Every structure is written in C-alpha cells, then in structure tokens.
Curated annotation (Swiss-Prot):
Gene3D superfamilies: SH3 Domains (2.30.30.40), Zn peptidases (3.40.630.10). Transmembrane segments: none annotated. Keywords: Antibiotic, Antimicrobial, Bacteriocin, Plasmid. The active site is at E525. It comes from Clostridium perfringens. It comes from the Bacteria. Induction: By UV irradiation. Residues 303-549 form the Peptidase M14 domain. GO terms for molecular function: metallocarboxypeptidase activity; zinc ion binding. SUPFAM superfamilies: Zn-dependent exopeptidases. This is Bacteriocin BCN5. May function as an ionophore.
Amino acid sequence: MANNIIPNVSSGDLVGSTPTFPPNAVVRGDFLYLRDVDGNQIPGRTVSDGDEITVLFISNEKNIVLVQYPTSSGYRQGYVTNATSIIKYKDDYSWVNGSTPEPVYDFDKTTQIGTLDPRERAVVLYKVDGMTYVAYDTGKGKLTKSGLVHYEGSGSSTGGGSFNGVAPGEVVPGGFTYENNAEVVGDELYLRDANGNLIPGRSVSVGDKITVLDVGYTKQLALVQYPAGDVVRQGYVTNATNLIRYFNQYSWHNGSTSEEVLDENGGHLGSLNPYEAATLLYEKNGMKHVVYDTNKGPNTKSGYVKYEGAAATRVDIPYPSITNAQKIVYGISGRGRELAAYKVGNGSNSLVFVCAIHGWEDNWAADGIELTRIGNGLIEHFQNAGTNNWSLYIIPVANPDGLSEGFTNNGPGRCTIVGAVDCNRDFPLGFSPGGVPRYHSGSEPLSVSESKSLHDFIQGVKNRTSGEMCVIDLHGWEGAAIGNPEIGEYFRNQFGFGQRSGYGDNRGFMIGWAKSIGAKAALIELPGSTKSHSDVVNGRYLQKIINAVTNLIGGSGGSSSGGSSFSDVSYEATGEVINVQSFLNVREGAGLYTNSIGQLRQGNKVNIVAKNGDWYKIKYGSEYGYVNSGYIIILKNNTSVKLEDWQEDCIKFGWGPITKEKYLEYMDSTRLYKSIENDISQAIKNKSLINVINPLNFSVSEMIACTQIVFNNETTSFFRDEWYSKSNPNFIVKYKKLSNGQIIVLDRINIKKPEKLKTKIPKAAKGAFKDTIKFEFFKGIDGWFTAISGAISIGSDLSVFQSNGELKSNEDIAKALAAAVIVNGVETMFCAFLGGFIAQCIAPEFPIVAAVAGAIVSAIAAFAIGYFVDNHEKEKYLMNSFKGLIDYLF
C-alpha cells in the first residue's frame, strides 16, 4: 500500500509527536491489540480505552484498520481489528452524496475500488489533495471500507465532526446555530454520541434552553445544542419527548394535500398528511425544519418541508361573567388552555350542555364562537335563575384550541390543533380510527386531551347523579335535533326544525356514547340559514335556547321577546355611562336581544328607577328603557330610607343631623369597617385565621383588598380576578380588566370614614412595628426552622443577623427566607406557619394588619406552589413576595 499520503513505517513504529491527520475517532469500552498488515498480533503493543486515534485506512478484505495512536514517546502507527463497537468516530455520516453515483478511489486517486449510491452517506476521516477520504458501509456491515472521493458532499465536516463539524460533547464556535426552540423539563438528559453511547461528564440540565437540530427516527436520538457555562456544546440525547418541551409545539400546519418531508439535500424522508400539525424547529435554505409525530409517538422524526404552513385565524375566546356559578377546570387542551365547565344549581338531576366541540362549523371562519357566546349566555342567565332540582354543567367551548387557532372546517379548527382529531368522532362507541381530515380520529378512542377530558367529566357527573341525566351537544348549522326526541322537542318548538333519527353511535359521536352510559342525549344543529353573528342575534337564538332549557328542567322561562326573567325592583339612583367606546344601547326590555330604542354615549348621566337582574331601568326621554349595569357607575344613591332608621343610626353613631345622601354614604362605609373588623378579629380570636382567610374565598378576598387600600395607603389592589382602585378618596371602585384592555366596573364601595365611628383598626399599617417586635418576629422564624428539623438551617440565626445589623435591607431578609424555604422544600409548612405566627406576634394590638398579612402569606403559598415548577422561578417569586410582605409589616 505504498503511497505519498500515509507514512511508510512498520506496525508499532513511531510517526512523530503528532498524527498525520487530526484524530477522527476514539477507542471506548475496551483496549485493542496492535497487529501487522496481515492481522498478526504485535506483542506488547495495545491501543488503550479512551485513546483518541486517527483512522487512516479500513481494509474491507481483512477487516482491519490502520490507525495512529498516542503513546508516552509519541504517536505510533499500526493495525487493529475493525471493532466498530469500540472505535467511535467523531463524524456522524456528515458526508452526503449528490443525485448521481460517486466513484471511490484508492490512494493513487485513479484506481476505482467502489461506488457510493445517490444520497448515500459516509463518515469523513480527513481531506487531502482536494479529495475527501471517507469510511462507508458495505455488505459486511457499517464502516467496513474506506477510500477517496472527489465530491465534497453536502456536509460541512472536515473530519472528526458531526453537524457543522462539531463532535458530540465539543464546543460550538460562535454559540447557538439557531435560536433556542425547546427546554429540558423534569429531569436531566445525558449526552451521547451518534450511536447512543454515553459521553462521560456531559449532561443537559433541567431548565436548559436548547436548540434541537435533528430528531433521528431509527435511533430516537435528538441532536441538540445546549448551554455549558460560558460556551455552547453539541451532542445527542435520548429523544425523551416527556422531557423535551418545544416552544412552538404543533405551530406548523399542513394544507389540504400531502407534504413531502425531505432531508437537507432533497432526499425523501417521509410525508405529512393533509392538515397534519408539526413543530417548527428552524428555517434553512428556504425550507422549514420540523419535527412531527410517527407511529413511535409524538415528535419522533424530523425533516424539511417546503410548504410555509397554513395561517391560523386568531380568535379571542369570550368568557362568561360569573357571579353565582362554580367554575370547574376538567382538563387542559393540547395547546395548554383550560377546559372549563360552569356549574349552576345543586339538584339531584344533571344536565351537561356542551358547546363548540367543533371550533369551526361550516358557514364562516371560526363560527363556533357563536356557540361559545350562547354557552356564556346560558351561564349568565341561569346563575341568577332557578334551576329547580337540577344541576347544570355548561361548557362554553370544548375545543378552545380549534376555535382560537384553527384555520379550516375540514381539519384543525373543526378538529383539535394538537392531533387534528374530530372530538365528535373520537368517543368509544362506534369508533373508527383515521378517516379523512374533516372527521379524523386517532388510532384509538379518546386520543386527544379534549375528548378524553370531556369523556371523563361527563362520566364523573353521571356517577354523582342520583336522578335524571341529560347531555346536549350544540352545533351549527344543519337545522335539526338528533338523538333523544324528548329533548329534541324542546328545541324544535323554539326553532321549528325537524327531528333526525339515530345517535351516531356507529361513528364515535359523543351523544351515542352518553346514551350508552344511561343519559338522555341529543345533538342540536342550529338553523342552516345562519350566515353571520347578526343572524344569531336577530334570530334570538340565545333566548330560544334559554326557553328550551328552562322548559326541559321544568322552570319558568325567560321572556319570549328576549328579555330578562327577572322583575323590576325599585331602586333610585343617578349614574354615569362608562367603558363605552362607541355607544350604549337603550333597550325596550331587560335583555340583550330586545329591541334598541336609543343610544347613550360615554359620560352621559342617567336617572335609574329600578333594577332588573343585570339591567337598570332608566328614564329615557318621555319613556323608559333598560341599560346593562356593567356600563353604569352609580354617582348618587337616591333610594328612600325610613326616617326612624335614619334618626336612630345618627344618634347611635353620634353623627348628628346629616342629609339622606350623607347618611347612605356613612352607612355603606360603616358596614365595610365593621365587617372587616368583626370578621377578621373573630377569626384571630378563634385561632382559625388560616382556615378563614382563604385566597379562593371571594368575600374575604374583597375584604382583604379593601383593607389593604384603606389602611396601607395603597392606590390599587388585586385579589382573585378583580381589581380595586382608590382613585377617589371617598370610595373604592371594583372592576375587571378584559384581555382587550377594556375595563368593566363592577361596584363602588364607600370608604369615607365617619368622624365619630370608633374602630380598633389603625389608620395605617406602615410604621406600626417597633424594633423589639421585629426582633421577636425573626426569633420566631428561627425557632420554627430549628423545631421542624435539626437538619434544616438557613446558615445563620436571622434574629442575630437582624440585631447585629447584618440584614441591611428588607430585600436581604426576603432573599434569606426564600432561599431557606426552597432549599429545604418546606414552602407549604412555612407559609402556613408564617400566616399564623404573624397573627400571634401582632395581635391583639394590630389584629387587622395581622389578618391581612396572614391572608397574603396564604395567597403567596397557593400561587407559588400551584403555578411554578422550576425552583429558581419559585424562589424568585417567593423572594419578591416576602419582600413585599416585610415592607408592608415593617
């Protein structure tokens, strides 16, 4: 094998202090005996486990490899057995052939010794004289022959590298090649080479933001770049789909035809079905690299596609205004949205009313939003109406992803985004896998979260129902009642359409399955003439459905004209129109679908004469009309009062002779002050502070918010999902912020304190603590950590730190507390202790401050533990929360 490329020395001889070409492989797992050109062992010579070597030549005939390897005296050259399980190449088949066969030559560059097929891959060993020396597969196995090729290949490796010439575990020059597209969650991932062998000392940590470059279907290895201190490294990890969370999960959607998946050079890898979703990783050379689902599971193969992807029609999902309904989150959608039902009533009979199981129906884009609006209207109506002996479970949107992010009524939109499954073909009874995109289902029933969660929720309601059980599935727009004719009749009477036979129990329908578990079930298709939102409004669909449901549950329905089912209640006040961008309709009845008789503008004053549910009856010109109370703020309460009550209260509280308006204002604020003082003080007295001050208890949360504003001189406060603002010194405005930035005022609470009203509540909490109390506070915390476990320590005694002046700021204190709590995993116990200890430490001198502080701690614990998984984020949140609490107290 005489040539001018490889040194002409005997096996075992030295070739110099460095190898002829850079090392391109490593010996891993065992040592290799050195041999001569005929394969005979050379005594006393071995290549050790862990040696980085340069492979110069592979003999296909003799199954031996010519290598240069390191010794104490320099690099030696010789042959070893071609043990492919021990010789690990740094390159991972980065050389890719073009579209024509490529001749392979011997070292003389003229004698052809083989051929590489079009698109065939090879491992780059080194480059010489404008040619590339590669190792490739033959009939004898992987990497069993080598030779020179003229074609440089599509890969950019110069030998010893994999993707972009970077060997597994090595540093990526210049940092990440593409933006991070995933995060490691739940557990660390060990770094591996291209064959799946562990690389000692290398791993990708939980929380690391990574760039996934490729996902190999055969070996299920993901090639990733990850942060390692100040550098970025590259290598393979097991494709643990439960640990690799993609940022753009299923963001790419195919169109109406199949899409070919290609390798980097245009070679065929696979295909994506019409409307199938995939996860975008990055873009390169005008193509998109996506990872997609296969029979091995989600995100198990990647490749390039040329199609840009279908554009979604983004829709903001409307939500109901809740005053007397229980929200039940029964699952999470594929894209992470809540799947929610709203319970109204508490009877022994149950009705589950499902809307928008199809985000897109068939008459216009995202028309499922009309079904969701109807669902919201049902909730808002029945939460203030009688339900007889029925419990109503109303689901406004069963497929929120499809409604919000969908793009077709023949795939994702009608179907789910993740999985592209038609939930109304995914139930167990009569299930068939696959199908065309419009009716697509998974390989087995309940294959997506939306259908599985809905199935489990309905089954759970059925299990808890002792009386009658009904299920209604609302759709559009075919104008028919399907399924149970008894239920259908209530809707046929309202809309005038016909009844169809069958339950779809041979096609995976939800109502077919519901019937099989003993429920009465019907699918309602709203009229086919519906072409717009205006048709829904003008057709009074909501009121008709309210009437149908009311008749079904045996109640007294609402007005057939679309008005409220409430009656007018005398109420005199002066109000002002707010939160109106264009105009506010004045309607002839107390209902959204009654006729408009006029319009009001922002800032218009109104004279209110009565209340009717969520509506105010007002004097409008020479007649009367109704306006929604959400758009009116009360400026002056004109409600009549009894003279004897007026006089008695003025004497009782020592207010003297005052006007009726001032009396009403004083009584409102007196109720607030007394309610706060009595309720919270009683909780402290009974030692039940933690049980009573619950951040999920609306009335107490409102109390806390008001207390914070009144007694801590705050401008705004936020509790649960509502804001409280003291923009006016005499009252607090309670309001909600909608996703579009609109503010809806809910109430106005008088807070101007009557001069002679005596209360134990201090005027302000700030500055209330003396240094001695602060010292006792920290002593108590130190004692708790000591008592809970001898092993738990926060480094030093907080009380000593405080007395020595070493905790120079409240931020220092908060950092110490947060770190101690997180490191020792005692969030729940500590927050519970802290709430009670604050009450004990502060009361009885400052009972209200103690109660508010305890409530804040409970809220901190509930929020931190419920919403944060990552300890770093949790610690940061607790630190900020504790600092705010300490600022509040001291």
